[in-house]
């Protein structure tokens, strides 16, 4: 397999989608690949024709695309482009893309990430059979909507 062909293929991916682009002329400036001669993995056709590229855009759950999840927060998305000229053998070009999985913090009772939603102070972790602590506010503010000019704007004048 020619190195130039591998450089003619680019892949971008997310946790759910794979986007692959292949140059229309991957071998040299005189040889075009016809749109009907290439497919992604399980005979999935080109989804978009660009000026200089063919594009394949598919969810990772289709077209025989493989998703390998590692114990870290990394995934590998694997596929291949099949190129079959009319009367010749089939050529397979590997497609590999890596993506970091998003790691969302666990949502806690009445707050997120261990902070109370109202006071932004840490909530102690509760153990089994223990009640959740009731959030408390240390100070109450009321808004004063009297007219003020720009120079008077301060925390004291707005919140009394």
Swiss-Prot record:
Please report which protein family the annotation says this sequence is part of: Belongs to the PLAC1 family.
Subcellular location(s) per record: Secreted
Answer yes or no on keyword Ribosomal protein. no
Its protein name is: Oocyte-secreted protein 4B
The record's InterPro entries line, in alphabetical order, gives: PLAC1_fam
Which keywords are on file for this protein? Secreted, Signal
Q: Quote the cellular component terms of the Gene Ontology held in the record.
A: extracellular region
Q: Which residues form the signal peptide?
A: 1-13
